[in-house]
């Protein structure tokens, strides 16, 4: 309020006193937290005649680059008419919805004599990184070489990160090797790039070779194994990190809680919670949501609900993880009641919400209610069904004694989900789950284990195939095999576990990973409280 009041006083003043008044104006512009305030200040500068003082204009230009309105920033830049102050424009493109326009702007001003520096290329490369266009990246790299900026470490780090984001890991590795004096950002960038491109073991090897590590380095590796479905290693890395003298930050704790939940390690999860109570006076929606998610996955739904009910701030992900906890691990009716409260509170559900709701209906045997929710999802909320929703409906019909409808639901996939992989798994699951014939499923699962013996999902799939036909000795045998190979603890067999595994096997489907494997917890980082 005080800041807005100062803006109003500045805007309505009849004149601006040079010296102290000018500095106060600079401060108001730089501290403005709203582009509307910036427009007001801009207008006042023009009407008072002070905008044409280049120092005012440049300060305004720098402030405008924070708001993501690149066209507004470009208009200020063009009105100044000075080529050398173009760098804020690249920053504006970076936070805007049109980063790909940055390269065109660069070549436009280059024709008029603009001389780029290392700051130019760091921002420009970051813009190209967001577009994932490796050809544009190479073009920018060539420009950095031409203007003598390619040996500047921040530029080299930016190029390396850009190449990994564009899938050109070999180019990134080549750059890394050629950097004579690497800093910790260089190491973190290449390790994160290896993880991003699926080479977790090589990333871990390089991580072990790092001369110095920071908390970001540890978070990268903890997250890497969590993303590779090996939460046990993530927890081991955290312990190693603590022994090395690092305390972790909010991101570390969210990753750790996620790992505890996904591996059903309630004891470790409680320990993290106790540590949070001892060390963090002010909680956050991210941490609170991670705690709810962890307790829910460890089947302590009552504890999860107590935390949920105590929160003053919740976002969509908070609601989703609580609904999922009830519907998958607790009393399904509690999740359905929470869903009704969610939509009555005018919070729009998403595809993850309906995964929980439909699974809850399957567990409770509520066929007509499940059909109604499915129709609500499609007709009212315009959410297109994916593999996950079809699988939930298949289990709903199967548990109610309608195997034909179950098979039909699973095979009736959306066009974009129909791939050789999804069709194969649909047929496999139909035969294994609904008709009680595990022979085909057993054969495929074993062949998958042979091709990737460290992927716990394949063992988990085999255990579920055995469990649906009551082959409990075989289930225990696979469990022992998992322990001997130290692949990591596997949660108990059940409807959700099988569903999660199958959905994750729909290769290349980012939507699938978001719906089941991660239960969308990672969205907490970007979702705002509601």
From Swiss-Prot:
Q: Which UniProt keywords apply?
A: Repeat
Offer one example of a GO biological process linked to this entry: RNA modification
User: Where are the annotated PPR repeats, by residue?
Assistant: 82-116, 117-151, 152-182, 183-217, 218-248, 249-283, 284-314, 315-349, 350-380, 386-420
InterPro entries with a match to the protein in the record = E_motif, Pentatricopeptide_rpt, PPR_At4g14850-like_plant, TPR-like_helical_dom_sf
Q: Where is this region: Type E motif?
A: 424-499
Any one GO MF term held by the record is: RNA binding
Q: Which PANTHER family match?
A: DYW DOMAIN-CONTAINING PROTEIN, PENTATRICOPEPTIDE REPEAT-CONTAINING PROTEIN
Family according to the record: Belongs to the PPR family. PCMP-E subfamily.
Q: Under what name is this protein listed? A: Pentatricopeptide repeat-containing protein At3g51320
Instruction: Name the source organism.
Output: Arabidopsis thaliana
């Amino acid at each position: 309020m005080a800041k807005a009041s100062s803006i109003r006083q500045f805007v309505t003043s009849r004149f601006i006193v040079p010296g102290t008044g000018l500095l106060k104006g600079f401060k108001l512009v730089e501290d403005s937290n709203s582009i509307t305030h910036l427009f007001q200040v801009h207008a006042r500068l023009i009407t008072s005649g002070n905008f044409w003082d280049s120092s005012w204009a440049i300060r305004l230009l720098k402030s405008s680059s924070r708001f993501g309105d690149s066209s507004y920033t470009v208009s200020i830049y063009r009105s100044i008419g000075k080529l050398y102050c173009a760098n804020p424009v690249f920053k504006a493109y970076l936070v805007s919805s049109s980063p790909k326009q940055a390269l065109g702007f660069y070549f436009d001003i280059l024709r008029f004599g603009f001389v780029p520096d290392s700051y130019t290329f760091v921002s420009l490369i970051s813009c190209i990184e967001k577009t994932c266009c490796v050809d544009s990246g190479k073009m920018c790299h060539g420009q950095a070489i031409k203007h003598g900026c390619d040996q500047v470490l921040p530029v080299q780090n930016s190029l390396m990160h850009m190449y990994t984001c564009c899938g050109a890991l070999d180019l990134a590795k080549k750059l890394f090797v050629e950097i004579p004096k690497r800093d910790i950002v260089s190491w973190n960038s290449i390790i994160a790039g290896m993880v991003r491109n699926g080479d977790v073991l090589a990333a871990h090897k390089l991580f072990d070779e790092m001369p110095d590590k920071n908390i970001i380095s540890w978070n990268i590796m903890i997250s890497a194994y969590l993303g590779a479905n090996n939460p046990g290693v993530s927890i081991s890395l955290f312990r190693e990190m603590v022994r090395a003298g690092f305390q972790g930050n909010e991101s570390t704790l969210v990753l750790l809680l996620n790992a505890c939940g996904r591996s059903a390690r309630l004891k470790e999860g409680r320990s993290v919670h106790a540590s949070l109570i001892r060390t963090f006076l002010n909680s956050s929606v991210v941490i609170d949501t991670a705690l709810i998610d962890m307790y829910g996955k460890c089947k302590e739904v009552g504890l999860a609900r107590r935390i949920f009910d105590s929160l003053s701030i919740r976002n969509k992900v908070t609601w989703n993880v609580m609904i999922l906890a009830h519907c998958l691990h607790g009393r399904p009716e509690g999740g359905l009641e929470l869903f009704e409260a969610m939509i009555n509170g005018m919070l729009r559900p998403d595809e993850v919400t309906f995964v929980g709701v439909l699974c809850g209906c399957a567990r409770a045997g509520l066929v007509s209610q499940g059909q109604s929710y499915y129709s609500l999802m499609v007709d009212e909320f315009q959410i297109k069904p994916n593999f996950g929703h079809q699988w939930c409906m298949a289990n709903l019909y199967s548990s109610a004694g309608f195997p034909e409808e179950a098979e039909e639901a699973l095979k009736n996939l959306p066009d974009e989900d129909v791939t050789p992989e999804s069709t194969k798994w649909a047929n496999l699951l139909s035969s294994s789950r609904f008709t009680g014939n595990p022979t085909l499923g057993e054969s495929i699962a074993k062949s998958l284990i042979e091709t990737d013996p460290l992927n716990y999902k394949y063992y988990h799939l085999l255990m579920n195939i055995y469990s649906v036909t009551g082959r409990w000795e075989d289930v225990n045998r696979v469990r022992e095999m998992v322990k001997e190979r130290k692949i990591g603890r596997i949660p108990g067999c059940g409807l959700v576990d099988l569903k999660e595994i199958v959905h994750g096997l729909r290769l290349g489907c980012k939507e699938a990973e978001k719906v089941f494997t991660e239960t969308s917890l990672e969205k907490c980082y970007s979702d705002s409280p509601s």
